[in-house]
Amino acid sequence: QHDVEQCHEGHQPFTDAAAALEQQLPGCIAIQCDVASRASCELAFHAVEQAMGKVDVLVCNAGIAQQKLFTDITPEEWQRMLDVNLSGAFHLCQLALPGMIRRKQGRILTVSSMWGQTGGSCEVHYSAAKAGLIGLTKALAKEEGPSGITVNCVAPGVIETDMMAAFTAEDKAALAEETPVGRLGTPEEVAKLLVFLAGEDAGYITGQVFGVNGGLVI
């Protein structure tokens, strides 16, 4: 039996998702949260603790993307990218850790990107933020290991999500052709790895970065 909490900046999409998931997994709740805001994270985390009592697993999956030449990125766009993709994980990890340390157990999972590993042209700010998540994961794993807490990172490749809404069918076909396995990934494939890393069988795995990219990054 697991309780599931989902946080999302826009309330309606995840309210709908939570309602659908509730039919399969009782105990799922949706909470609105802007991870770029410490105050919003604190309110959301308090709501989760009130509803569930404790947080055993934290998945830092919030993210935004933007394709733009580096010389055209505004300071505001740079800061927003870091606030959502990196600082959000910082806020939530700081809120989750005291309880995990007290209980001497916990799982923290961050979701980076293959561009956090290799860098992406025209996505320098995105790549920098996602690379920061990898650094956070590795350092935090060393710091929290003695407290029975594991910290791991999943770095997806080209996955069929809303972030690809602007891509044409031709763009997607070209990306699939570049991928050694010959297709794009699915959210379910990423989720199944996260579920494993959150479970008891992954207790000796920490500080690692797992690529889910069909062989694009080897």
Language-model-detected regions and their locations in the chain:
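The beta1-alpha1 cofactor-binding region of Rossmann-like NAD(H)/NADP(H)-dependent oxidoreductases
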Residues: C33-L43, P75, E188-E189
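Catalytic Tyr-X3-Lys loop
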Residues: I64, T71-F90, Q105, L109, ...
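Substrate-binding pocket helix/loop in short-chain dehydrogenase/reductase
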Residues: L69-F70, E77-L82, M164, D171, ...
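Active-site loop-to-helix junction immediately N-terminal to the catalytic Tyr of the SDR YXXXK motif
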Residues: I73, G119-S127, A139, F167
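Active-site helix of classical SDR
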Residues: C93, A129, T137
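Alpha-helical segment proximal to the catalytic Tyr-Lys
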Residues: P98, K142-E143, G203
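Residue(s) in the substrate-gating loop at a strand-loop-helix junction
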Residues: S113
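C-terminal helical subdomain
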Residues: P146, C153, A176-I205, V212-G214
